[in-house]
């Protein structure tokens, strides 16, 4: 049950953040605050999730990494939603395999697939926090996305 809640929480928190981001116009979406912009953070989240599935699925086509940088706001938010859904589904399945990590340090190393997926879930949560800070500095009402809030909402 814990991993199902974690997977559902990931979707819920991402949805709340994307809902607010979808209301921004192009200028606000690209406005720099605290050294970055909502666009740059969303691109980073999407690129990280693309990287996750690139390695898990053994992809060879790297063109997705260039395309992400050119996506307009709505397409970027939609891609984030698609990748969040894939990650949540993968976590629900509690995978048992290993994956070789080649993009972190010079020497590849193996980790459990579940740990690999959790890294991207935690990474996304970290950047959702950065988005919250930037959006609050833009005087927007930022939704709370704490795990306990999610549990309260589903109870």
What are these regions (language model features)?
Residues 58-97:
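Helix-adjacent hinge/juxtasegments
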Residues 16, 20, 82, 86-90, ...:
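Solvent-exposed, charged/polar functional surfaces in cytosolic regulatory/catalytic domains
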Residues 94-101, 142-143:
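A short coil-to-beta-strand element that immediately follows conserved catalytic motifs
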Residues 4-19, 26-66, 105-155:
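Short, contiguous alpha-helical
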């Amino acid at each position: 049950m814990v991993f199902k809640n974690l997977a559902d929480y990931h979707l819920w928190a991402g949805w709340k953040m994307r809902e607010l981001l979808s209301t921004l116009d192009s200028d606000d979406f690209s406005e720099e605050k605290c050294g970055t912009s909502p666009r740059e953070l969303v691109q980073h989240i999407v690129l990280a999730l693309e990287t996750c599935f690139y390695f898990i699925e053994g992809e060879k086509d790297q063109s997705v990494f260039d395309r992400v940088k050119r996506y307009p706001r709505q397409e970027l938010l939609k891609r984030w939603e698609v990748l969040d859904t894939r990650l949540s589904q993968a976590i629900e399945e509690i995978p048992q395999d290993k994956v070789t990590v080649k993009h972190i340090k010079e020497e590849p190393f193996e980790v459990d697939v579940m740990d690999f997926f959790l890294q991207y879930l935690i990474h996304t949560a970290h950047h959702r926090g950065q988005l919250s800070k930037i959006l609050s500095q833009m005087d927007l009402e930022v939704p709370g996305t704490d795990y306990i809030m999610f549990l309260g909402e589903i109870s």
